[in-house]
Curated annotation (Swiss-Prot):
Keywords: Cell inner membrane, Cell membrane, Membrane, Virulence. Residues 66-238 are annotated as: HrcQa-C. It is found in: Cell inner membrane. The gene is hrcQa. This is Type III secretion protein hrcQa. It is a peripheral membrane protein. The keyword Isomerase does not apply. GO terms for cellular component: plasma membrane.
Length: 238
């Protein structure tokens, strides 16, 4: 049997992906309307979108698809990227950004030198009034981390299918035996663990997902049930 080989993932990339999770949402207001900016993971690996625009922001460089429409929804005035880019125009645009977005991104301005570091992509959704926009954003992992840590984003959660089950071994005790002792065991032999996880009343502890939980076993109709009551904290966690 060949060993399972997992691809190596950069630690910063893994951290950014984990913080993005199932998605993060940020509420804001613009042009007198309540709005919401949402970042979501890509459904599949995708390269940088054609026609996207690199922009310099306070948290780092961002690559945006459909940048004109996206940025226009983040403030009180429409944005155009056509024609000659003048400093006064971008200054006005930044002044009319939603205060929430301005604290996060301003100053926003064109970026002429594309970053050479690998980027991480995500989907962008904006809802404002009756308008809705879907776009893509790419950024380096450290820029995405700064983006997610520089405002009061709200993590999105996914409903877990009730039919989904997780199998975990129930360890009732532990002991060490030599090979000779194991070979000598016969059906019906009684083995007493040196370290017991449960007592004779069915009360004990279960290690699950790196945590320890107080547990109680019950038997009904020839079936064994296990009930977790609360998490047991280790002394160093206080």
């Amino acid at each position: 049997m060949s060993a399972l080989r997992l691809r190596k993932v950069d630690a910063l990339l893994a951290q950014a992906t984990r913080e993005l999770g199932a998605g993060q949402s940020l509420g804001f207001s613009a042009a007198g309307q309540d709005a919401e900016l949402t970042l979501l993971p890509l459904l599949a690996d995708a390269g940088e979108p054609a026609g996207a625009v690199w922009l310099s922001t306070a948290i780092g460089p961002l690559l945006l698809s459909d940048a004109e429409a996206l940025l226009s929804l983040l403030g009180d005035i429409p944005l155009t990227l056509g024609g000659e880019q003048q400093a006064w125009y971008w200054q006005l645009f930044n002044q009319r950004l939603s205060p929430t977005v301005a604290r996060l991104l301003a100053p926003v301005e064109p970026l002429h030198n594309k970053p050479q570091a690998p980027t991480l992509g995500c989907r962008v959704q904006i809802r404002r009034g009756g308008e809705q926009l879907h776009a893509h954003m790419h950024a380096t992992p450290d820029t995405l981390l700064r983006l997610l840590r520089s405002a009061s984003w709200q993590a999105r959660t996914r409903t877990v299918d009730e039919s989904w089950s997780v199998a975990s071994p129930l360890i009732i005790g532990e002991m060490s035996l030599t090979r000779e002792q194991i070979a000598s065991l016969r059906p019906g032999d009684v083995v007493l663990p040196a370290h017991c996880q449960f007592d004779s009343a069915g009360q004990g502890f279960l290690s699950l997902a790196g945590r320890q939980w107080a547990a109680q076993t019950d038997q009904h109709a020839q079936r064994l049930f296990l009930r977790l009551s609360h998490e047991e904290h280790r002394h160093h966690e206080y």
